[in-house]
Amino acid sequence: MSNIKSSEISDILKMQLKGIDSRIKFEEIGRVLQVSDGVARIFGLNNAETGELLQFDSGDMAVVMNLEEDNVGTVLLGETSKVQEGDRVKRTKRIVSIPMKNGMLGRVVNPFGSPLDGKGPILGKEIDMPLERKAPGVIYRCPVVEPLQTGIKSIDAMIPIGRGQRELIIGDRQVGKTTISIDTIINQKANYETGDPIYCIYVAIGQKASTVANIVNTLKEYGALNYTIIVVAAASDPAAMQFYAPFAGAAIGEFFRDTGRHALVVYDDLSKHAVAYREVSLVLRRPSGREAYPGDIFYLHSRLLERAAKIINNDSVAASMNDLPNNLRGQVKGGGSLTALPIIETQAGDVSAYIPTNVISITDGQIFLETGLFNAGIRPAVNVGISVSRVGGKAQIKAMKKVAGTLKIDQAQYRELEAFTKFGGDMDAVTRATLDKGRKNVELLIQSQYNPLPVEKEIAIIFIGIKGLLSDVPVERVREFETEFLDILEMKYRKDILDMLKQGVLDEKIEKKLNTIASIVANNFK
């Protein structure tokens, strides 16, 4: 037998070992212990994270909500009937997110980015935006000073909204809350056409599919769908989908905000969102508190609404923003904004209930709509007394600030006098004039739905009202006067007056012209 050298043996062994694939892949697999009411308890996923997506063998997905001692509580994103006890579940190691693409504009999607409008797949480069994300820190924000025009006279004049603000729309059912938000979206068409778009996200939570279809058709009819994304979790969808819908809207808005653009997100409505979260929490056996809502219901809405912000206009500072998604790095720009219009439904006008008071305390103001005003034909039915914008005149152009400065006080005085005169008695000339002016201003601020006005026309018509130039026009003909007055301005004075008002200029020369035109038109209505 020939001698074998030890070095040869080691060489042979090394060659043999090189061919061995030692990469062992581990997959954490769990089993469904219990499933009911849209919730599954899973055993065996000891390393699962809160908010992580899990996948069943059937392809259905679930999200981890509870981490308990011997199992994890998850909410199902599909039908409960498709998941059974004993089914295998595996971790995806991905936090729940929405694949954002520029091709999403004009589309109707679910909270996870899947199209619902039957127009085929959504095109464009995909960027995963996490649904849950920390709000920008204080150093990455700047004050709200740029106006977001709603096109609604009473709001733009007395309760102005700025880019980056959170303004609550609150009122009973059927008083025009959704109409205000849709009008605001339609009014952004001019910005889109001039190359300074405000991208709009409308989030429908727990609404009927037919209602959402009507909203889509309205936006399409008025040419607003090109810059709008509609996120839908309908009434027939699982509670988990309704719970995640507003977070999906916020994530889409953050994509525009963090790339230096402007976005507006409407949450319609957060009352149904709170109910969906309560349902999920109760089924997960979380401790309940007031009105059976879980203890963190305030935190649910505060962490959602705090994501609305005006970002500092400095690219290098914005690029270091906290909690940025990795796939967004390198595209971040400063100067963007995300404005939020949450909607809350009250019961019999009770704004002191649990969820309304929570959201009022989180937001930067509220627009309160009243059933009595709506039924009296005063639409939008804004109760100016308890409606407020905490940003105020900072979010108005100079001309609007100048004409609307006294309007809120004037209308409050009118309401007070009107209540007093119901007791009867004689009135002096000043009181009669104040009441007459107040009534005509109320009539001037009435506006039909889906008919937003450009800011320059709002300024012109409010100027006429506060200067008392309608004294010779009967109350019932004020709206006719408004139509004729604005038509004359558009046809003959677009450059001299309207374009100047649009730039915020309202000097003595323009005031004299407006006075003269108003007097001429008023003569036709005596």
Swiss-Prot record:
One of its GO terms (cellular component) is proton-transporting ATP synthase complex. PROSITE patterns: ATPASE_ALPHA_BETA. One of its GO terms (molecular function) is ADP binding. InterPro entries: ATP_synth_asu-like_sf, ATP_synth_asu_C, ATP_synth_asu_C_sf, ATP_synth_F1_a_nt-bd_dom, ATP_synth_F1_asu, ATPase_a/bsu_AS, ATPase_F1/V1/A1_a/bsu_N, ATPase_F1/V1/A1_a/bsu_N_sf. The lineage of its organism: Bacteria, Pseudomonadati, Bacteroidota, Bacteroidia, Bacteroidales. PANTHER family: ATP SYNTHASE SUBUNIT ALPHA, MITOCHONDRIAL. HAMAP family: ATP_synth_alpha_bact. The record marks S387 as: Required for activity. It is found in: Cell inner membrane. F-type ATPases have 2 components, CF(1) - the catalytic core - and CF(0) - the membrane proton channel. CF(1) has five subunits: alpha(3), beta(3), gamma(1), delta(1), epsilon(1). CF(0) has three main subunits: a(1), b(2) and c(9-12). The alpha and beta chains form an alternating ring which encloses part of the gamma chain. CF(1) is attached to CF(0) by a central stalk formed by the gamma and epsilon chains, while a peripheral stalk is formed by the delta and b chains. It is a peripheral membrane protein. This is ATP synthase subunit alpha. It comes from Azobacteroides pseudotrichonymphae genomovar. CFP2. Signal peptide: none annotated. Keywords: ATP synthesis, ATP-binding, Cell inner membrane, Cell membrane, CF(1), Hydrogen ion transport, Ion transport, Membrane, Nucleotide-binding, Translocase, Transport. Belongs to the ATPase alpha/beta chains family. Its EC number is 7.1.2.2.
